[in-house]
């Protein structure tokens, strides 16, 4: 270390070049700062960050599967069959008033069966317009009931053919039997596509998306030349 007097009476103390007591230690960057810019994923989310969540992308397979069966057409056919049942049932009820022997009329099959067909057809038409899971499941449930009602109605109609001897009654029963069998197959087709749509919706993939934090920040590059070292210490005159 050397001391040189200045012209104004101030001593300037210059430490040697190899002295390391006054030199600051080199800056050490953390390991995470040395990563290249990009997308960094943290195992532990930082405080206040959103936790990873499982999201399900919109899947169009259930809708396409359900629409393949033309639910609007099937529903319209079911509504027409239900109205035919109500109409022919009312006619038979008035014609056979005071007479017994037709179980199809005495059991009210054309009325509760026709109402079931109309409800299932209406839900099928509504499910094609809105594509909601609730409507698809409701349509499936009512179609199952329609299949059961059509099967029971067909069995009762076949029994009535052996009971009545009037040609007029047999004609009405024949028409009702044809439309009841048609309703059975229509409801089975609608039920088939409804089951496929629900199965496709249940097997839709779930994608797990972890939190991704952007790290597109620029790390300052080291300077080409070191800045000048300010290693001169000035002492005022008379200060020890």
From Swiss-Prot:
The keyword Oxidoreductase does not apply. It is a multi-pass membrane protein. The chain crosses the membrane at residues 73-93, 100-120, 144-164, 173-193. GO terms for cellular component: plasma membrane. It is found in: Membrane. Its main location: membrane. Keywords: Membrane, Receptor, Transmembrane, Transmembrane helix. The keyword Membrane applies. GO terms for biological process: cell surface receptor signaling pathway. May be involved in signal transduction as a component of a multimeric receptor complex. Belongs to the MS4A family. This is Membrane-spanning 4-domains subfamily A member 15. It comes from Homo sapiens (Human).
């Amino acid at each position: 270390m050397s001391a040189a007097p200045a012209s104004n009476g101030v001593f300037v103390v210059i430490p040697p070049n190899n002295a390391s007591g006054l030199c600051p230690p080199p800056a050490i960057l953390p390991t995470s700062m040395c990563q290249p810019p990009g997308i960094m994923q943290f195992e532990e989310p930082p405080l206040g960050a959103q936790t990873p969540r499982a999201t399900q992308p919109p899947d169009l397979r259930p809708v396409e599967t359900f629409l393949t069966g033309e639910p609007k057409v099937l529903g319209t056919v079911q509504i027409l069959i239900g109205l035919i049942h109500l109409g022919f049932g009312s006619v038979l009820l008035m014609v056979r008033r005071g007479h017994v022997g037709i179980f199809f009329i005495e059991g009210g099959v054309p009325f509760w069966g026709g109402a079931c067909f109309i409800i299932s057809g209406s839900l099928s038409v509504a499910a094609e317009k809105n594509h909601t899971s609730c409507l698809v499941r409701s349509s499936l449930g009512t179609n199952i009931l329609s299949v059961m009602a059509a099967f029971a109605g067909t069995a009762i109609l076949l029994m009535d053919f052996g009971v009545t001897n009037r040609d007029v009654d047999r004609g009405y029963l024949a028409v009702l039997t044809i439309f009841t069998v048609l309703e059975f197959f229509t409801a089975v087709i609608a039920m088939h596509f409804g089951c496929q749509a629900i199965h496709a919706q249940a097997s839709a993939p779930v994608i797990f998306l972890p939190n991704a934090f952007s790290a597109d920040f620029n790390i300052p590059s080291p300077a080409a030349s070191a800045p000048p070292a300010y290693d001169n210490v000035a002492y005022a005159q008379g200060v020890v």
